Amino acid sequence: MSNPPTVPRQTQPTFLFVCKDGPTAPEKRIEHLAGHLAHVEAHWQSYVTAGPLKAPGSSKIHGSCLIVCADDVDAAWAIMRGDPYFTCDMFESVEVHDMTMSIGLYPGGKIWESLDSVRERANGG
């Protein structure tokens, strides 16, 4: 396997939403599916990726994961608040994290030049 190329750091902030289903989620997921799909299709260019969460080997959905590019966390939340899955109180909890896309297919490689540059950023530099 080849080494990944070094690519520029993404300038737009990225936010990871990890949503845990509440007890009525299965019914609400079906009831609001059409509206949810319409919303994510309308905003598809804001998503790095998104989808349901399941335990390995299970077909039962127990939450959702969404990675969103937005100018700031308030703008990311504005996108989420337009989604019927968020407005119907389907989720028991929602965690939001500021995320740096550091390596992978989406960024097209890795964003660091050397181990020292990663250490410097990890220490707040």
Indicate where each model-derived feature is located.
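Conserved, structured core segments of small domains
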Residues: S2-G125
